[in-house]
Amino acid sequence: MQFKAPKNNERYFWTSHVLGKMQYYGLSAQRILRVINNPVRKEEGIAEDTVAVMQPSSINKKKTWSSEIWVMYQLDTRPNDRSHSVGRETQRKIISAWRYPGISPEKNSIPAEIMEEVKDLIN
């Protein structure tokens, strides 16, 4: 199977690090975006101003799973040059992605208030 690198656009910026990790772990761009858009758990990333999101590798009705897919990204707000409206568009800079064998322990979860603010910025 040949690896096809995703292209950068106004919503997502793919770093070379995440492209290498995607190829190593056999993750597609669509799978990474699905983890970002529908995470089971959100935490603060280990790098400054980052968010880490997780989704089980196989989603079913069980509350236990054998491995997890993690994605770390950073929100980047820049003026939108293409539209004439006044406002800012949020771009997600996808930094890294990895598979975690087993179930990872919960660490610093992001409070619901902050997640609502992030959702308001995105929409």
Put a short name on every predicted segment.
Residues 1-123:
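Ribonuclease/tRNase effector modules and their secretory precursors
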